[in-house]
A protein has these predicted regions:
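RNA-binding basic/glycine-rich loop and surface signature characteristic of RAMP-family CRISPR effectors
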Residues: 1-296
Length: 296
């Protein structure tokens, strides 16, 4: 059995009446829904990572095997990858080390979540009630708020398994030529497996988007393709895209099989495939019983 070197999750989640990632103030004094030039709304990759790490934090807090691990706040990331999951899985750039900047490339990467089709954007008129006329001489405050009516959002996450819990160190000779690379492991195999499973679990637990008090949405998938890959590929992120034909979908799956990758398809809208829940359980079981790549 080939070792699993990376995991790709590509999923479709329905968002209704949402403002999951407002952006520029195109309407004056209220934020507008982020959307592309083609009219499709999107949630930025930064927001997707925020929601994913929020899910990882909750899952880790409930895990009796978490030990002294934690997920640091986004504004206070440490460089302790043995304990800080955001530092390990999310990477960091530390500029407080004198002439040297500590830099860690994130094992987790995410794409923006993009609507499959052109979005229909609605507008709410907001009025700030002036209860006491003596309080302010300004005119009554009016604002327009945008929301998107209904979108099937395609989102993608990728994990470089070999980079989890490890730092890469370079050896140079007197001429300052790079002559060797060494890997330092900061966690044992059990903790490595636990963090990989946390990533998978978090990708189906996406809820902490913006504006959840008034425009709550769920990023939990309706359709999903999970790839346990012996290599490093993100080609399968095209699987659910609107322009991908059934022929191309079949070609993607055949290529995965030819490379020795395992894949799991979940679809809650048909009985042709397993449900999303079943697909995740199958993938987690395969990770649990498989061999994960760790550089040495």
């Amino acid at each position: 059995m080939k070792k699993i070197a990376s995991i790709l999750v590509t999923a479709v989640a329905p968002f209704n009446d949402h403002a999951a990632n407002r952006g520029e103030k195109l309407l004056g004094n209220a934020s507008s829904v982020k959307r592309r030039p083609d009219g499709r709304v999107y949630v930025s990759g930064q927001m997707q990572r925020h929601v994913l790490f929020s899910a990882i934090e909750r899952l880790n807090a409930m895990d009796p095997k978490r030990g002294d691990t934690y997920v640091a706040n986004g504004d206070g990331i440490s460089t302790d990858i043995a304990k800080d999951l955001r530092s390990d899985l999310g990477g960091f750039l530390s500029t407080s080390k004198g002439d040297y900047s500590g830099r860690r490339i994130a094992p987790i990467s995410a794409t923006p979540a993009v609507a499959r089709a052109k979005s229909k954007v609605g507008h709410d008129l907001l009025i700030r009630l002036k209860m006491n006329e003596e309080e302010s001489k300004q005119k009554q405050a009016l604002a327009v708020n945008e929301f998107s009516q209904a979108d099937d959002m395609i989102m993608n996450f990728h994990l470089d398994i070999g980079a989890v819990g490890v730092t890469k160190k370079f050896e140079y000779n007197k001429e300052e030529s790079h002559v060797a690379t060494h890997y330092e492991q900061h966690i044992n195999d059990d903790e490595h497996l636990r963090r990989v499973k946390l990533f998978l679990e978090a990708s189906r637990s996406m809820t902490d988007y913006a504006n959840q008090a008034r425009n709550a949405v769920s990023g939990e998938p309706r359709q999903v393709l999970i790839v346990l890959d012996p290599g490093m590929s993100r080609k399968a992120i095209r699987y659910f895209e609107e322009g991908t034909s059934s022929i191309e979908q079949e070609a993607i799956l055949k290529e995965l099989q030819a490379r020795g990758a395992q894949y799991f398809i979940g679809d809650d809208t048909t009985d042709e495939y397993s449900s999303v829940y079943e697909a995740y359980m199958q993938a987690i079981d395969a990770v649990q019983n498989g061999k994960l790549y760790r550089p040495s």
